[in-house]
Amino acid sequence: MTAKKDDTLSPQITTAGDTRRLEFNGTDIAGVTAEPLTPPDHVVYRWLEFSDFEDWAAVANWAVDLFNAGETQSADFKSAAAAINTKSTPEERAVAALEFVQSQIRYFSIALGESSHKPTQPDIVLQRRFGDCKDKALLLVALLKQAGIKSSPVLLSTTRRKGLDQSIPSPSDFDH
């Protein structure tokens, strides 16, 4: 577990069996009022972060395992891949794959349980004809692979523009 520490407030640590308890107490802590429209990168409140990830490489490895499309075998997938592969150049195939995912798969998110972070397999997305950003990204990567185009999904934050290097390693920093 990695912890980023604010040295102005130290925990009282107690241990009972396999459980370690950190208790933080503060008195006379000044209140903070955030200004309207403050950029999300500028955090004015105190907070405490914990992570099970030792470094950013561990976060990347966690994500790589989630974004494994396996072998896509459905007739829908084979049909979409065949249509994309009728294009002559890699650029045309990439555009065709992107246009297919954008126009044929509705955006709909069911972010409950494992679906909050693990993409649905491409065959299921094609059968349902809907998926969230993760689902559509994994489908696009699988279609591009069938078109002979190497690609990889990436994690990103739509709200944080900077400061990631000052966060503790955690997938919670990403929302897409």
Language-model-detected regions and their locations in the chain:
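Contiguous, function-dense segments enriched for cysteine-driven chemistry
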Residues: 91-94, 123-124, 152-154, 164
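Active-site-proximal structural scaffolding
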Residues: 17, 74, 90, 94, ...
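Secretory-pathway-linked proteins and extracytosolic
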Residues: 1-115
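Conserved hydrophobic/aromatic pocket- or pore-lining residues that grip, position, or stack substrates
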Residues: 97-101, 133, 144
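Hydrophobic/aromatic-rich core segments of domains that either
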Residues: 134-176
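Short, conserved phosphate-binding/catalytic loop or strand-edge motifs used
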Residues: 76-79, 113-123, 157-162
